[in-house]
Amino acid sequence: MKRAIVLSGGGSKGAYEAGFLLAAKELNQHFDIVTGTSIGALNGALVAMGDYEGLEYTWNILDMDHVFNNAPDLTDLKDDFMTTSLFNKEEGSNLSELKESIAQQTSLAQSFLKYYFKNKGADNTPFVEHCRGLMDEERLLSSPIDFGICTVQFPSMKACYKTKSEMERGHMLDYLLASSACFPVFPMTEINGNKYIDGGFSDNLPIDLALDMGADEIVVVDMHLIPVHPQYINRPSILYSCPPVDLGGFMDFNKDALERNKRLGYLMAYKLFGNYEGNQYTFLPSNQTVFHDYYKQLLM
């Protein structure tokens, strides 16, 4: 029986995943397989290596200065700006609200593109160097936990799935960066002459990859209010979780936002594994005997 955890992409919302994963470790939840896309791939690699200290450290210190050199403020840029889901998610909005939202997102994107072209590309050197300091190929390869990621080949836009055994030695970090290369916010990654961009352009939540790797039971950490793969909800062998509230923009590295999301992920893990209860709020497990006795007295 192999148990997997699947981690979605979402940029700075990865703090939510970090909180979830740290809580899962506290609860002694064991996983034989970890798969992830984008920030989920980066968080997942640390879990596969057993480096929970590195995971916690990353989300304690991460801010915009640890991601880019001299980048504009992209706090409110939505992770679905470049997809039609922007329109789908706002079907309930009136036309003026929709226009305002699109105008705001366009303005943010234009601000970034000015920075991008002025500097001949986005300089994400701080983020790359931080990841390099954490990545240990031998530790990942020798781990009993199998690991896989999703990235996308460019310009074919074809999904590319890689397990750790399929990644060329010396390029494991490159594949992690490729999976999280949310172009054009992040530059493309080139590996052996092939260009790759963020796996979220194809599969932002690689559940099928976990199944292909032999998972019998799967825990899913989806960071979207609207599930990425609703077809997997309520499956007997899949525990599928989504956040109870919107986690904000995918480039929001404000400390308060990161701490909030990390706490939300932490509480979600405790609820998913049956230690806490609630949806919008969190409660200790209810004592059904107390409720039974109370209502019995009312009826007598």
Tell me the role of every PLM-derived stretch.
Residues 1-37, 45-300:
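Patatin-like phospholipase
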